[in-house]
Amino acid sequence: MSSNNVVIKIAQPYAVALLDLAKTKKVTEKVSQDIQSIQNILAQSDKLKIFLANPLKTVEAKKEVIIATVGDQINENTLSFLMILVDRKRIGMLDAIASKYLELAYQMESLTIANINTSIALSPDQETLLTEKIKVMTKAKEVKLIISVEPELIGGFTIQIGSKVIDTSIRGQLRQMASHLDVVVT
């Protein structure tokens, strides 16, 4: 089993527990916003990610940093959950747990996540049109687009919804032609 699968297996019960707590306390939307904020902070700060994952740092130090960083910005239930992760030495997996939580929360809300990689930024009209097409394609009530610009696609875009990938990029087309011609393309 790959290390990624192990992380997912460990993250799942924590994500489920947080979702159950949020549903019980009727704060699912607030906790989801908190988790998204935390993910954004982690994405912007490699130092924080490394600090939280460092087994040599004390539990108290990690709790102090979490409280100083997000303590006044998040719901008390979310903060308590983070403290439990620190106590159980799982705070280093926070990013994976957060991703799993959001995936479960979005499933509960019938929200589909679509990861879009484009060669250039999309206009608001293009985003709206793409959202509507994906709603029809997936029969979802709501679609959330996570858009990233990757100039190396040359042109076009890729869409990933769950395990399904739609590649309309020029890079993808070149790879497909190269495979038909038995040529290696990087």
From Swiss-Prot:
GO terms of molecular function:
proton-transporting ATP synthase activity, rotational mechanism
Cellular compartment(s)? Plastid, Chloroplast thylakoid membrane
Summarize the subunit comment: F-type ATPases have 2 components, F(1) - the catalytic core - and F(0) - the membrane proton channel. F(1) has five subunits: alpha(3), beta(3), gamma(1), delta(1), epsilon(1). CF(0) has four main subunits: a(1), b(1), b'(1) and c(10-14). The alpha and beta chains form an alternating ring which encloses part of the gamma chain. F(1) is attached to F(0) by a central stalk formed by the gamma and epsilon chains, while a peripheral stalk is formed by the delta, b and b' chains.
Keyword field contains Transport: yes
The keyword DNA repair belongs to this UniProt entry's keyword annotation = no
Q: Pfam families, per this entry?
A: OSCP
Q: Tell me which GO cellular component terms the UniProt record holds.
A: chloroplast thylakoid membrane; proton-transporting ATP synthase complex
Q: Tell me what topology the record assigns in the membrane.
A: Peripheral membrane protein
- Superkingdom: Eukaryota
The protein's name in its UniProt record: ATP synthase subunit delta, chloroplastic
Keywords from UniProt, A to Z, are: ATP synthesis, CF(1), Chloroplast, Hydrogen ion transport, Ion transport, Membrane, Plastid, Thylakoid, Transport
> InterPro entries of this UniProt entry?
ATP_synth_OSCP/delta_N_sf, ATPase_OSCP/d_CS, ATPase_OSCP/dsu
Task: Name the PROSITE patterns for this protein.
Answer: ATPASE_DELTA
What is the stated purpose of this protein? Answer: F(1)F(0) ATP synthase produces ATP from ADP in the presence of a proton or sodium gradient. F-type ATPases consist of two structural domains, F(1) containing the extramembraneous catalytic core and F(0) containing the membrane proton channel, linked together by a central stalk and a peripheral stalk. During catalysis, ATP synthesis in the catalytic domain of F(1) is coupled via a rotary mechanism of the central stalk subunits to proton translocation. This protein is part of the stalk that links CF(0) to CF(1). It either transmits conformational changes from CF(0) to CF(1) or is implicated in proton conduction.
Query: Which species expresses this protein natively?
Result: Pyropia yezoensis
Q: Which family does it belong to?
A: Belongs to the ATPase delta chain family.
